Amino acid sequence: MKTDPNKEKALNAVLGQIEKQFGKGSIMKLGEDRSMDVETISTGSLSLDVALGAGGLPMGRIVEIYGPESSGKTTLTLEVIAAAQKQGKTCAFIDAEHALDPVYAQKLGVDIDNLLCSQPDTGEQALEICDALTRSGAVDVIIVDSVAALTPKAEIEGEIGDSHMGLAARMMSQAMRKLAGNLKQSNTLLIFINQIRMKIGVMFGNPETTTGGNALKFYASVRLDIRRTGAIKDRDEVIGNETRVKVVKNKIAAPFKQAEFQILYGQGINSTGELVDLGVVHKLIEKSGAWYAYKGSKIGQGRANAGKYLIENPEISDEIETALRSMLLSKGEKVAAGATDTAGDNVDMETGEVF
């Protein structure tokens, strides 16, 4: 297709002027001089990484994780921090709920000596700290726990019973506008943990909604709905939760997939159990009766013992995980045993529409 040389000349002139004024890379052709692959950080769950399509949560984007109480929201974000720190990245935790347990974080593999932590007094202070860390370009992952705890200054200084209609929503809307561009420039991953509330008077559809207004829903590249679906028992003792995560929104890959995994109390996501299950499904691990074998060598009787063997032999665990990732995250194949194509009962939070 021929182009008008005068138009081409004018375009090159204006592109040069824009780059001179706003910096190199401020405008470019979509397929030119840039990698189309999004850099990601693992969530700690292989099936969730596969359900997300890109192998984890995307850098330079906003992510929202919401769900009921004790569903595993903070655990999931701590797993992300642990994975990021293993890659040498700097992480920060904005603890607006004042409830972060450093002992539990350490058990999940978080290097608490190198984790930046802030417990702000107001919502504005929390978001300003977020913005300052982002603009510095020195922090790679920021967690805000939680949006519901980001209390506007006017509400804190006022009295209980005072009406502050829409204050938190306006605060979040302004913060999103300010943060979105800075996050892209600094390639910082910002994760907001959010809580669920019930809409009053909703007779049809889903009455659930998230706090902080609609701005976060629009600006988030990924939204994850995390729910506890059952208990894991060792005889009569409950030792963990069966957990399901639905990818409600995804701007980097196909949305509406879901992943199921286990969260063990005091240990976090049962990643070795996932490896055993996925390894069997994709024929990397042989199962004969109750026995599991890898490359002809028995690794344990029963899933728990096979998982224990992988913990004690990290090189074999890494080998299986690498093989599974290359198998499941290449050639467009994005579905694993714990990551399904459709989220069956996935419901839009606003309309109540079932996907």
Swiss-Prot record:
An individual GO BP term: DNA recombination
Keyword DNA repair: yes
UniProt superkingdom: Bacteria
UniProt main location, coarse: cytoplasm
A molecular-function term among this protein's GO annotations: ATP hydrolysis activity
Disulfide bond residue pairs: none
Compartments, as annotated in UniProt: Cytoplasm
Residues bound to ATP: 67-74
This protein's GO CC annotations: cytosol
Keywords: ATP-binding, Cytoplasm, DNA damage, DNA recombination, DNA repair, DNA-binding, Nucleotide-binding, SOS response
Function summary: Can catalyze the hydrolysis of ATP in the presence of single-stranded DNA, the ATP-dependent uptake of single-stranded DNA by duplex DNA, and the ATP-dependent hybridization of homologous single-stranded DNAs. It interacts with LexA causing its activation and leading to its autocatalytic cleavage.
Protein name as catalogued: Protein RecA
Upper lineage: Bacteria, Pseudomonadati, Pseudomonadota, Gammaproteobacteria, Alteromonadales
